[in-house]
């Protein structure tokens, strides 16, 4: 009974194993994990990132301490000759004569580091982020709190990079050169050893770090150049203080007579002149005698960096996945579509080609929407710079941009200071969110246009939109006729002109038509309301990053946080860094410093500690100033008159030497 028939016995040879473990022939042997095709393996540098960051953090702290020894606080200790060590300022935001390229580069480095922090698993690399192992044996650590600490860490790490430029000392330039080269060397070393990473996209880390490398490269070149200049000239570059070319250029441009363009030139080149005027109103072009404040320069630089970073993230997060899906389409997709009742063709290979073609069209729509979003955001940025310049010039002249009594006061307030501090950060966040919203809207619009209009017309199939229009054409024709007939009747029947004044006529017919067409106008109003919603959404999405424009009506403009921040930002900028006020304070301080030392050589620049003193010079309230106010006011008025008469170009032709020279007489 236990024996089996001979026919069921197999021939001698290698026995076949039908166990479950041998069913998957692609399973790696020996417990090895098979790397999926196209996936980038994890890359580890020869030197761990924790050591990199520990060295950079230590070097930054050392540089900050040395800078604190160089920068002395004379205000709190006026009797002490050497002063007390103080924390150096990273950026002089309200100093209009400082170099603007270094703060812009530092902020680009900081923002790019924060963008790389988002997908990073170790926000603080020099700390061990480990927790108790989970049930599957893998360690899991909460990353949210560490990422928040990472925000402060990278800001503190970039602090000495910016502070070395404001110290105005040869040793500070040497420290800045060392620190910038250390940062650049670490970044280049990491990207050279691990150009590909498995996060988001294999080249995302390399592409996202390009602004970071550009900013560090600029700093690593700028600091050595300033160091060489300081050794050659024996003066720290960038320490001119208030006496600089910008204030003088602003006053010169303000006092000189404006030249009027000839009408013949305009008529001869009418189209070119009109195009140039339109270009100047839409795109920012530098003009002599005016320089944008540092905060606006930082906002523009961060906006460009944010456009690049967000566009890169949207591009590498979507396009490679679409390409992988298109490359992996097989004939099985026909069964998947048939399950949803979609039959593209009886031929399975033709279905594969159609699906690949549709995926390619989807990729084209996505890239087109991204290009359109970036272009519109960049144009809005250029238009905003023109508006900033116009508003600042108006405020410099003493004009008011709105009728609100809150913004008429020139004095700073607590809310205004807070808005000034957060302006550049708000601008960057608005640009990022606005670009994301624009990408969604434009992608949906281009996809609907491609799949409902263009591709059905080209291929002659899937005419869903045209079939729906064919079935509902009486409805749309009725609405169109109602609109056209009312417009024609309003122009030819219900309106006539008497003595050059238009007047209503045929009022009975007008009342009857209004009553009878009310149901149709309700339907037309529904279509108009839909169009209004779409148009307002598109307009607000495009102008979301434009803080100088309120997205709310004028009566509710103060409820717009972006517009409110912008108005208070302008108040602080105009009240604290007016170029004319800066120039006059500089001249007064020079006269005050040269008064007790008549025989001494004139100074070419002011000490860095005298800038705040000059800002408060016109606002002194001591008893001696109150007693000598009439005499001081009279002397100040005479000095202003003399300065104007000497430096006004329009009055030079009326001087004695010029008149004698014109008459041919000897002076």
From Swiss-Prot:
Region: Disordered, residue numbers: 1-22
Intramembrane segment boundaries: 510-547
Membrane topology according to the record: Multi-pass membrane protein
Biased composition (Polar residues): 1-13
UniProt entry keywords in alphabetical sequence: Cell membrane, Glycoprotein, Membrane, Phosphoprotein, Receptor, Retinol-binding, Transmembrane, Transmembrane helix, Transport, Vitamin A
Transmembrane segments: 51-71, 99-119, 145-165, 169-189, 206-226, 296-316, 368-388, 423-443, 474-494
Topological domains, Extracellular: 1-50, 120-144, 190-205, 317-367, 444-473
MF annotations from Gene Ontology: retinal binding; retinol binding; retinol transmembrane transporter activity; signaling receptor activity
Region named Interaction with RBP1: 235-293
The organism's place on the tree of life at top rank: Eukaryota
PTM note: Phosphorylated on tyrosine residues in response to RBP4 binding. Phosphorylation requires the presence of LRAT, suggesting it may be triggered by the uptake of retinol that is then metabolized within the cell to retinoids that function as signaling molecules.
Residues carrying Phosphotyrosine: 643
InterPro entries hit by this protein: STRA6-like (IPR026612)
Cellular localization per UniProt: Cell membrane
A cellular component annotation (GO) from this entry: plasma membrane
GO terms classed as biological process: camera-type eye development; retinol transport; vitamin A import into cell
Segments in the Cytoplasmic topological domain: 72-98, 166-168, 227-295, 389-422, 495-509, 548-667
Name of a matching Pfam family: RBP_receptor
Function, in words: Functions as a retinol transporter. Accepts all-trans retinol from the extracellular retinol-binding protein RBP4, facilitates retinol transport across the cell membrane, and then transfers retinol to the cytoplasmic retinol-binding protein RBP1. Retinol uptake is enhanced by LRAT, an enzyme that converts retinol to all-trans retinyl esters, the storage forms of vitamin A.
Assembly description: Homodimer. Interacts with JAK2 and STAT5. Interacts (via extracellular domains) with RBP4. Interacts (via cytoplasmic domains) with RBP1.
Domain notes: Contrary to predictions, contains nine transmembrane helices, with an extracellular N-terminus and a cytoplasmic C-terminus. Besides, contains one long helix that dips into the membrane and then runs more or less parallel to the membrane surface.
Protein name stated in the entry: Receptor for retinol uptake STRA6
